[in-house]
């Protein structure tokens, strides 16, 4: 399949016969109703929010490369723009302008839908917007929403690995499935602790409950285990067995290039950013640490929430530069034989205390 990935995707999108009707309905000025204005405004703010997320993901990659370069006593990317500030955009243009190639033995439709599913899943995760600015889009069942969406993320990895019809990709997908199932049990136990303490599934209630500091001490004890679980769930070093280069060449995405690889890359780093933000809300107070945003203002809440998210991201990147890759069988033995029995006992004791 020739042509660039971007051109191929645009051709498929524009071939849909009904797209221009929606465009006319949104942009027409005849009989402009309040409902249409609300739809246009919601669409504008949603697109603006996701543009901010994409920009954050782009500069997260640059930040990681700079930290890894500093840990290895080298300069890192600095050729494109001032101090390499335009490097993420150069990488994105390079990837999306390359030829979109489909392996001959693969399933073309599922091969294309795999990265799309991963990117869509990462965007749906941000639908709850858990307090990155202290005034996110909260709702009462936000905690259950995040847990439900997080649990289906592995399907994109399995879809990419299976549709590639490659042994390396399939082994990476099977590893991802086993690892996520194993550590999702631990994730659920740790994730529910803040909600049991507060007595609500609202993320804002969890964030505001830590303002007084009465719950912060209890939840802070859970934080190291949670960070450990986040590293395993997001396939980050030292638990990046899904993309084990020394064993699986590149894991489940070995057959992907151009825009497909870029979409997988964006989805993975978007999930890292989301989990960092979720960590700051559940265990560090997020943007509400100094009180409600109405007292300190939106800007101060934004700075505080972003600072805590940045610190968690920095810790994740620092783990990659500091620790070697763990062994896969030892990782499985660690969770099932050591961590999970201790964690279940502590969780039962925690429920009796509260």
Curated annotation (Swiss-Prot):
Its EC number is 7.1.1.2. Keywords: Electron transport, Membrane, Mitochondrion, Mitochondrion inner membrane, NAD, Respiratory chain, Translocase, Transmembrane, Transmembrane helix, Transport, Ubiquinone. It is a multi-pass membrane protein. Its main location: mitochondrion. GO terms for molecular function: NADH dehydrogenase (ubiquinone) activity. It comes from the Eukaryota. Coiled coil: none annotated. The keyword Transport applies. Belongs to the complex I subunit 1 family. This is NADH-ubiquinone oxidoreductase chain 1. The gene is ND1.
């Amino acid at each position: 399949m020739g042509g660039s990935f971007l051109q191929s995707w645009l051709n498929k999108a524009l071939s849909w016969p009904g797209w221009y009707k929606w465009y006319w309905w949104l942009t027409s000025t005849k009989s402009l109703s309040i409902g249409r204005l609300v739809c246009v405004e919601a669409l504008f703010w949603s697109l603006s929010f996701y543009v901010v997320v994409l920009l954050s993901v782009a500069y997260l990659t640059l930040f990681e490369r700079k930290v890894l370069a500093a840990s290895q006593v080298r300069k890192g990317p600095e050729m494109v723009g001032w101090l390499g500030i335009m490097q993420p955009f150069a990488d994105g243009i390079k990837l999306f302008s390359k030829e979109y190639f489909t392996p001959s033995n693969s399933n073309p439709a599922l091969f294309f839908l795999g990265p799309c599913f991963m990117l869509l899943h990462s965007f749906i995760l941000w639908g709850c917007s858990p307090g990155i600015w202290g005034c996110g889009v909260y709702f009462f069942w936000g905690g259950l929403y995040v847990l439900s969406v997080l649990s289906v993320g592995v399907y994109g990895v399995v879809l990419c690995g299976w549709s590639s019809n490659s042994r390396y990709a399939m082994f990476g997908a099977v590893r991802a499935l086993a690892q996520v199932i194993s550590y999702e049990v631990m994730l659920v136990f740790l994730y529910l602790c803040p909600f049991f303490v507060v007595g609500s599934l609202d993320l804002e209630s969890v964030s505001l409950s830590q303002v007084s500091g009465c719950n912060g001490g209890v939840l802070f004890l859970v934080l190291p285990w949670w960070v450990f679980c986040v590293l395993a769930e997001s396939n980050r070093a030292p638990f990046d067995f899904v993309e084990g280069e020394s064993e699986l060449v590149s894991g489940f995405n070995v057959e992907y290039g151009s825009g497909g690889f870029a979409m997988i890359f964006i989805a993975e780093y978007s999930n890292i950013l989301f989990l960092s933000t979720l960590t700051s809300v559940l265990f560090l107070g997020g943007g509400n640490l100094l009180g409600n945003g109405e007292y300190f203002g939106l800007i101060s809440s934004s700075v505080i929430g972003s600072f805590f998210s940045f610190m968690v991201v920095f810790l994740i990147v620092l783990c990659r530069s500091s620790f070697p890759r763990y062994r896969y069988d030892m990782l499985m033995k660690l969770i099932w034989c050591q961590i999970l029995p201790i964690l279940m006992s502590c969780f039962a004791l925690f429920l009796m205390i509260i």
